[in-house]
Amino acid sequence: MKKSLCALLLLILLPLGTTQATEFKLTGRTTWQLGQLMVNGMPFVIDDQTRFKDWLNEDDLGGTWVEMKGVVENGVRYVRKVEALDEDDKDEMDLEGPVEGGRIWGYTTSDNSLAPFEGRWLELECKFDGMRLSRCREDD
């Protein structure tokens, strides 16, 4: 009887202790500020679960153009995968994250194409001119 009651309590309480992680994806130039990895002024966390592609390592991240994938847990952005990108290939971006205040990951648009997605967390494909996004559309 005690075992089944404990198992039942565990099944009831277990979901309360779990947190939902939301995946993100962004492209941008990294910087280090006071020991914190930043992209567009937003902090990201590198930890023992972060994987670096090809030749890239943590020491290379200052000023490098990268694609980052990760999860947001309890408001903290954990990087899970980092890949260096060729600066010549940055005319298009695939982004996944929140559209808030006409921005996604700190990027604004030149054509207001983020407006239909305001308040949503989604995957987008956008053109990029080196400063601003344009022609953003939901990724298929």
Language-model-derived ranges and their functions:
Residues K2-P43, D48-D140:
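Short, flexible, surface-exposed loop segments at domain boundaries
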